[in-house]
């Protein structure tokens, strides 16, 4: 992450993140309400310093079902206070009495039924409440906050995506070179995700360094902010109009998540991907579907206050975007 370009400049201050779990609060928001009936038992949980997979296994064991019959919208940070939904597939079975469920760091907030499985893709986004300890109120930090509110921040994948010390990316590169064979399904998924996240980050960083993060290029693939559908900015388009729409946040410039049939739009993308052909080949070999992702992200409802302990932030991000990518534009972090 240190080598990736900043949208502003490298921060001047250093702050502490996640000194305590309460310094990093995440509340997920699904894209729908629970139906109240159906074959799935939906359980809303508040967990402190707990791994998502660990809690899922304990809930499944309590309900007497296989862990594979559990569902959730995504993995949440361990060193944090997080609220998220789990679902248990229990057709024709009564709802367990979760008042009897006991696990350190876990509180059951709500239990209901639902008519479909909660899975990746169910998540609309996450609300964040973050305390950056030891951050000092000064003019530079205030300008950074205002710039993020106005212009957004690089939509980088951050350290969580790459594993401890970049282990997932290292393993993906070894796999691509034929040095290892990966049989475990979850590891395969983690390694493939890390590999294409790395390519995405490099492309975003290159565009920022070249001053192209707010400039639409011929053949760029743009995303409509409302529907999230894509279209090509080919030579027939009115580029002055496209730039106006970009400034109004009606459209967004995207970069690729490489996979099968990846559409390479600009010379910047071509140049980066050409240097990582072994990873592109691995994506084809594993039949990963290609996708696109906005290169910049706008934090919704961003607000802040300086308190004696440091800087307190609250904001909302759509699914897939990382709060630590926003924080990176503000301060250097000691965890």
Curated annotation (Swiss-Prot):
Q: Which UniProt keywords apply?
A: Isomerase, tRNA processing
Domain TRUD: start-end pairs: 152-308
The terms under GO molecular function for this entry are:
RNA binding; tRNA pseudouridine(13) synthase activity
PROSITE patterns recorded for this chain? Answer: TRUD (PS50984), UPF0024 (PS01268)
An example of a Pfam family matching this protein is: TruD
Q: Which reaction does it catalyse?
A: uridine(13) in tRNA = pseudouridine(13) in tRNA
What's its EC? 5.4.99.27
User: Does Ion transport appear among the keywords?
Assistant: no
Per the UniProt entry, what is one GO biological process? Answer: tRNA pseudouridine synthesis
Query: Can you list the GO cellular component terms from the UniProt entry?
Result: cytosol
* Origin superkingdom: Bacteria
Active site feature: 77 (nucleophile)
Q: Which HAMAP family match?
A: TruD
Annotated function? Responsible for synthesis of pseudouridine from uracil-13 in transfer RNAs.
Database matches in PANTHER family: TRNA PSEUDOURIDINE SYNTHASE D
Which family, according to the similarity comment? Belongs to the pseudouridine synthase TruD family.
Q: What is this protein called?
A: tRNA pseudouridine synthase D
Instruction: Tell me what organism the protein belongs to.
Output: Histophilus somni (strain 2336)
């Amino acid at each position: 992450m240190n080598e990736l370009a900043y949208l502003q400049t490298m921060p001047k201050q250093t702050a502490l993140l996640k000194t305590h779990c309460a310094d990093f609060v995440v509340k997920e928001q699904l894209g729908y309400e629970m139906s109240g009936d159906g074959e799935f038992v939906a359980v809303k949980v508040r967990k402190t310093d707990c791994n998502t997979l660990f809690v899922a296994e304990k809930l499944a064991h309590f309900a007497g079902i296989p862990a594979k019959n559990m569902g959730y919208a995504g993995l949440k940070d361990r060193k944090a206070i997080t609220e998220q939904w789990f679902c248990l597939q229990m057709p024709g079975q009564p709802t367990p009495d979760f008042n009897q469920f006991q696990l350190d760091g876990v509180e059951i907030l709500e239990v209901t039924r639902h008519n479909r499985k909660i899975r990746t893709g169910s998540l609309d986004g996450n609300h964040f409440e973050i305390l950056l300890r030891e951050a000092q109120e000064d003019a530079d930090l205030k300008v950074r906050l205002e710039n993020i509110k106005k212009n957004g921040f690089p939509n980088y994948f951050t350290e969580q995506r790459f594993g401890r010390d970049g282990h997932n990316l290292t393993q993906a590169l070894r796999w691509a070179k034929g040095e290892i064979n990966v049989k475990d399904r979850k590891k395969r998924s983690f390694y493939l995700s890390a590999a294409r996240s790395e390519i995405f980050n490099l492309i975003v960083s290159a565009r920022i360094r070249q001053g192209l993060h707010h400039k639409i290029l011929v053949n760029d693939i743009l995303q409509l902010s409302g529907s999230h559908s894509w279209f090509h900015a080919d030579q027939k388009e009115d580029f002055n109009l496209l730039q106006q729409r970009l400034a109004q946040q009606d459209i967004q410039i995207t970069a690729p998540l490489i996979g099968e049939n990846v559409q390479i739009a600009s010379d910047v993308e071509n140049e980066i991907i050409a240097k990582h052909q072994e990873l592109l080949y691995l994506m084809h070999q594993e039949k990963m579907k290609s996708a696109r992702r906005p290169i910049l992200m706008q934090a919704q409802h961003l607000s802040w206050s300086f308190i004696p302990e440091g800087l307190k932030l609250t904001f909302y991000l759509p699914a897939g975007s990382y709060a630590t990518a926003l924080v990176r534009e503000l301060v250097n972090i000691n965890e």
